[in-house]
């Protein structure tokens, strides 16, 4: 359940203070707080006990919120949802209401354009080959970019619990995911570089299993990312 290889690397560090600091950061990924005044080995024991406690908690009966739920809620808030499908109420709570702008636009009248303006219209011959090429280029440009994980990537998030399990994700990382529907295409655009490995790990599990169940730390709610 605990990443023993990573723990061994930390224990091998010459600077014990740095090792315990990194160990505390590792624990925070699961929403676990540790006391840094304890010895390294005792902190490891505390983390293992906390992970066992998390693993024994019952799994949620629902799949939580998906990215589609969040997108539908955002579309509904902006008046862009045109189907009759009901918006998930939990997703709607996560989406802020649009900000009303008080900007005033001043309309300035200009001289009217004469109605009898002579406009030269030239007939351009239709070239089917060029048209099809232009359409193909547009379709290609609109394809979503695909992010490729680093070669031999190994996730730093460990799944806990029964079946496929779940992983704990800091709330501020989940908030960015919820606000960025295409986050899987450009995870490195998140301004906090310390979160990139976590995002890579989530993409790893989604690519492998089709989805990943996370537990965000603010409300301890479960959410399914696809």
From Swiss-Prot:
Keyword NADP belongs to the record: no
Which superkingdom is the protein from?
A: Viruses
> Where does this one sit in the cell?
Virion
Primary place of residence?
Answer: virion
Q: Which InterPro entries match?
A: Phage_T4_inh
Give any GO molecular function from the UniProt entry: peptidase inhibitor activity
Keywords carried by this UniProt record: Protease inhibitor, Virion
Q: Does the keyword Transmembrane helix apply?
A: no
List, alphabetically, the GO terms of the cellular component aspect: virion component
Q: What does this protein do?
A: Inhibitor of the prohead protease gp21. Minor capsid protein.
Name this protein carries in UniProt = Protein inh
